[in-house]
């Protein structure tokens, strides 16, 4: 009887320890991605995403709450409908309306996880300068904190082409938004750029490199971690190293037949 009791006690202790072991979470956000990955269709080669889909759960009836960055991300990161958050534009702050709302990353932080983030998770116009400071255990890594390829340097706005760099060089004191407005006004805002440069010459490559370094650092912590990684593509403009463009034959890209503005869509949803 004593042996049975001891065995049961040991099993209970082991079960308790296992129950307390939390998983580490890598949360990846992608901007403006249509369901054209290999898990849904063979339209374009997406081997990395296909591997993730094969190992996990693929949703076949998932819908975006709103096709605008601010409302969509506010909804995803709070678990609330846009009609509840009342974030319908690209300027209203989430906490200006809901000061005590609990975000996804904040919930994990409140429950013992170490939370960190890089890139575009919240729309920056919907949160404070710290990308909703209370959601993170450490300072959030904004795009301007990233390390870019040493040879190319960081992109000007989104670009590395000489025309865009020339316009931006005229006013070196201008911030990111001012530079982009100037590029747009001077027709130096191309929809596509395909230069023969390394991944980390552009934002998403630099974001990925930072995420890899963060994973290695966070793995050494005693706490479980939640790392949020927000990629900016395939949102316009379509800028990426040439090697990725070379994977696809332009002749195989089908233009969607419907080219009109959807009824009720805000103007800035189609300004690109």
Where does each model-flagged region fall?
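Formylglycine-dependent sulfatase
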Residues: 2, 18-272
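Sec-dependent N-terminal signal peptides
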Residues: 4-14
């Amino acid at each position: 009887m004593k042996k049975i009791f001891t065995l049961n006690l040991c099993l209970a202790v082991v079960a308790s320890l296992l129950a307390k072991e939390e998983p580490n979470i890598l949360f990846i956000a992608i901007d403006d991605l249509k369901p054209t990955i290999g898990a849904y269709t063979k339209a374009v080669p997406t081997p990395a995403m296909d591997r993730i889909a094969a190992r996990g759960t693929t949703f076949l009836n998932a819908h975006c709450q709103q096709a605008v960055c601010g409302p969509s991300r506010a909804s995803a990161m709070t678990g609330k409908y846009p009609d509840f958050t009342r974030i319908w534009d690209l300027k209203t702050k989430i906490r200006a309306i809901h000061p005590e709302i609990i975000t996804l990353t904040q919930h994990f932080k409140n429950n013992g996880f170490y939370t960190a983030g890089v890139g575009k998770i919240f729309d920056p116009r919907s949160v404070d300068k710290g990308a909703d400071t209370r959601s993170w255990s450490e300072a959030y890594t904004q795009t301007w904190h990233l390390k870019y390829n040493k040879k190319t340097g960081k992109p000007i706005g989104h670009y590395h082409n000489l025309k865009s760099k020339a316009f931006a060089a005229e006013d070196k004191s201008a911030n990111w938004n001012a530079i982009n407005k100037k590029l747009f006004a001077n027709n130096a805002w191309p929809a596509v750029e395909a230069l023969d440069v390394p991944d980390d010459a552009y934002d998403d490559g630099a974001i990925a490199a930072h995420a890899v370094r963060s994973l290695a650092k966070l793995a050494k912590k005693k706490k479980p971690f939640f790392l949020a990684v927000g990629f900016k593509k395939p949102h316009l403009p379509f800028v990426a190293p040439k090697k990725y463009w070379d994977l696809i034959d332009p002749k195989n890209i089908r233009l969607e037949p419907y080219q009109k503005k959807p009824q009720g869509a805000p103007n800035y949803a189609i300004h690109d």
